[in-house]
């Protein structure tokens, strides 16, 4: 799906569910990581996350578009467009738009684990942060530490 197709989709969804035209730009933003989309208040444009389209398909993308169009139309008409506003929640229910989008499966960053071992007493230290082995020593016997394993 390219920029023209997403623009057409947003315009169609706006007319079908809201009965009002979408007069601004809709585009994909590759920098969005965990958000499905966002409505920009100053430009009135809508940015969408392409990864949600890849992962969940067009149905989820239409849900995200409906959510962002709720922000758009309420803001344009001067009503409460924020998540906490009653107007926003009522319009979400009326057009059957999701309040939150699905969670990204690969959104969780894998944790790095560093395993250090004392050269003298063989005590192992498991750390999430890397330590300077020239500066720090074993807390038990003051022996030299050695990095055994680094997982990422």
From Swiss-Prot:
Q: Which residues form the SprT-like domain?
A: 7-148
- Report residues binding Zn(2+): 67, 71
Determine if Electron transport is one of this entry's keywords.
Answer: no
| Intracellular or extracellular location(s) | Cytoplasm
The entry lists its GO molecular-function terms as:
zinc ion binding
InterPro entries reported for this sequence: SprT-like_domain, SprT_Zn_ribbon, Uncharacterised_SprT-like
Q: Which cofactor does it need?
A: Zn(2+)
Q: Name one GO biological process term.
A: response to stress
What's in the GO CC field? cytoplasm
Origin superkingdom: Bacteria
Active site at which residues? 68
| Co-factor remark | Binds 1 zinc ion.
Taken from the record, one Pfam family name reads Zn_ribbon_SprT
Which family does this protein fall into? Belongs to the SprT family.
Listed HAMAP family: SprT_like
- What this protein is called in its record is Protein SprT-like
